[in-house]
Amino acid sequence: GLKNDIIYQFYYIALYDYEKGNDADDLRIIMYDYEDKELYLECEGIRLAIEYIEFLELIKEIIDE
């Protein structure tokens, strides 16, 4: 439904921002800004992207060792 659409839109936007050079900390700052505005679905999308990014970075670190 619409709620899932909002979550996934912000998930993909956050991943796009990551590809363009923002790191997980930058995305966290953006997420907290949405949280202050009580836009929780947007927050959830960004949070999911941060979780995925941190997972990818961990795998990359393991592979590089």
Regions found by a protein language model. Give the residues of each.
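Conserved small-residue packing positions in alpha-helical repeats and bundles
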Residues: A14-L15, R28-Y32, L48-E51
